[in-house]
Regions:
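Conserved GHKL (Bergerat-fold) ATPase module
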Residues: 1-379
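Conserved small/polar residues in nucleotide/adenosyl-binding loops
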Residues: 380-387
Length: 389
C-alpha cells in the first residue's frame, strides 16, 4: 500500500447533503486507459453500502479518482436505472468535479513539483477529456481543463502551461507552434525546426499520441491559433521571412518544369512539390496539408486499424542545398532518364525517413543508394599503382 498522491475530504450541508472522501492513487493503474478498467466511486446512504463503482458521479476524464460518497438523500433500495436519473446524484457529481478541479488548480499554483508528479501519472486523462469533449461537454470541458495542461518545449526541457508559453511569446509571434514526435531527439532533428530555432521561436513538444488530437479540438488558446510545424506554411511575418518567401517564389517560377516533372515522377505519392522557404541546411522535408490530418494523426489512425485517414503529402525541396543544383543538372538529361527518376525517389524516401515513415519498397531504395555510392567511389577513388602500370 502506498500513501495516496492527494486526499480530499468534504462534508456538505444545505439543499443537498453528502460527505465525500476522494483520493488520487500514488500511481496510475496499468490498465487505466483499457476497456477492462472500471472507474467509479463507492456510494453509501447513511453509512449503508449501495454501490461499488458508480460511474455517473464523475466525468470520464476523472476516471482515475477513487473514494466514496455518503448521502442521506439516496434511497437504500434505489435501482441503478433510477440512480442514473437522480437529480441529487447529478448535483453531487457537479460539486465533486468542481472540488477536484479546484484542488488541481491550487496544486499547480502552489506546489508545482507535486502537480508535475500528478501530470506524469494522470495528465493523459485530462487530454483525453479535451479530445472527448467533441462528443460530450464541448467548449465547457475545454475551458475547465485548458489551464491544467503541461508540455515541454524546444527551449526548455521542463513542463510549462499554455499560459506560460503565451506570456513568453514575442509580440510579433501570432501563432502557438507545436511539433509531434516519439521523443525530444526525434523532434529536435526535424528539418522544419531549423528556421524556428534560428529565429528563437519556442515550439511545444507533443510526445503523446493524444496531444495533437486534443489541440485540434481546442484550435486556439487566448486568441492564438495552434499551428503544427509540419503542416502548411509557417506564416512567419518578420521582414527576413517575407524576403525569403519572395526569393523562393522567384526560384520556383524559374524551375517550374523541374517541379512539375518531379511531381509527375513521384505520381500520387505526393499531392504537391514545392520549393521550400523553411529549410536551412536540410535538402528536403515532407509537410502535410493544413486542412487534412497530420502525419502523426495518420499513424495513430493506422495503429488503430483505421488506415482511411491519410495526410496530403507535400514534398518541399531546399533550393540552396547542393542536391538541388545536382537535381537541376540531372533534369537536363530528361525527365525519363534513370538518374532523374532515382534522384526523385531517393529525395522522397529521405523525406519519409525524416518523418519516421518507411518507404514503400525499402529494398529498392537501398539498392539505389548502393548504386550511387558505387558511382561516387569510382569518381573519387584514385587508380592503384597496378592500374597506372
Amino acid at each position: 500500500w502506498e500513501k495516496p498522491m492527494e486526499v480530499m475530504h468534504n462534508k456538505i450541508e444545505g439543499n443537498i447533503e453528502y460527505t465525500s472522501l476522494l483520493f488520487f492513487p500514488a500511481h496510475a493503474p496499468y490498465n487505466l486507459y483499457h476497456s477492462d478498467y472500471e472507474p467509479g466511486l463507492q456510494l453509501y446512504s447513511r453509512h449503508v453500502f449501495i454501490m461499488d463503482k458508480c460511474k455517473d458521479l464523475l466525468p470520464e476524464y476523472l476516471r482515475f479518482v477513487k473514494g466514496l460518497v455518503d448521502s442521506p438523500d439516496f434511497s437504500l433500495n434505489i435501482s441503478r436505472e433510477l440512480l442514473q436519473q437522480s437529480r441529487e446524484l447529478k448535483l453531487i457529481g457537479k460539486n465533486l468535479e468542481k472540488t477536484i478541479l479546484k484542488q488541481l488548480a491550487n496544486t499547480l499554483k502552489k506546489d508545482r513539483s507535486k502537480y508535475e508528479q500528478f501530470w506524469k501519472e494522470y495528465g493523459k486523462s485530462l487530454k483525453i477529456g479535451i479530445y472527448g469533449s467533441v462528443y460530450n461537454g464541448g467548449s465547457d470541458v475545454v475551458n475547465k481543463l485548458k489551464d491544467l495542461l503541461l508540455f515541454t518545449t524546444s527551449k526548455e526541457d521542463k513542463l510549462i502551461t499554455l499560459k506560460e508559453y503565451v506570456e513568453n511569446m514575442p509580440e510579433s509571434q501570432k501563432k502557438i507552434y507545436y511539433a509531434t514526435g516519439k521523443d525530444r531527439a526525434s523532434i529536435d532533428s526535424l528539418p522544419q525546426m531549423e528556421i524556428l530555432r534560428d529565429k528563437g521561436i519556442d515550439v511545444l513538444y507533443f510526445l503523446d499520441n493524444v496531444d495533437e488530437f486534443a489541440i485540434e479540438v481546442m484550435r486556439e488558446y487566448e486568441g492564438k491559433p495552434f499551428h503544427s510545424i509540419s503542416r502548411g506554411d509557417l506564416d512567419l511575418d518578420d521582414v527576413e521571412s517575407q524576403e525569403v518567401k519572395k526569393e523562393t517564389e522567384t526560384i520556383a517560377k524559374s524551375n517550374e518544369d523541374l517541379i512539375k516533372d518531379i511531381k509527375e515522377t513521384l505520381g500520387d505519392k505526393v499531392a504537391e512539390v514545392k520549393i521550400s522557404s523553411r529549410l536551412k541546411s536540410s535538402a528536403v522535408c515532407l509537410v502535410a496539408d493544413e486542412q487534412g490530418p497530420s502525419f502523426a494523426m495518420e499513424q495513430a489512425f493506422a495503429d488503430a486499424n483505421n488506415p482511411m485517414f491519410k495526410a496530403r503529402r507535400i514534398l518541399e525541396i531546399n533550393p540552396k542545398h547542393d542536391l538541388f543544383a545536382r537535381l537541376q543538372k540531372v533534369h537536363e538529361q530528361g525527365k525519363e532518364s534513370t538518374a532523374f527518376k532515382d534522384y526523385c525517389s531517393l529525395l522522397y524516401a529521405q523525406a519519409l525517413l525524416i518523418e519516421g515513415m518507411m518507404p514503400e519498397d525499402p529494398s529498392a531504395i537501398a539498392n539505389k543508394i548502393a548504386e550511387l555510392m558505387a558511382k561516387y567511389c569510382l569518381l573519387y577513388t584514385s587508380p592503384s599503382p597496378r592500374d597506372r602500370g
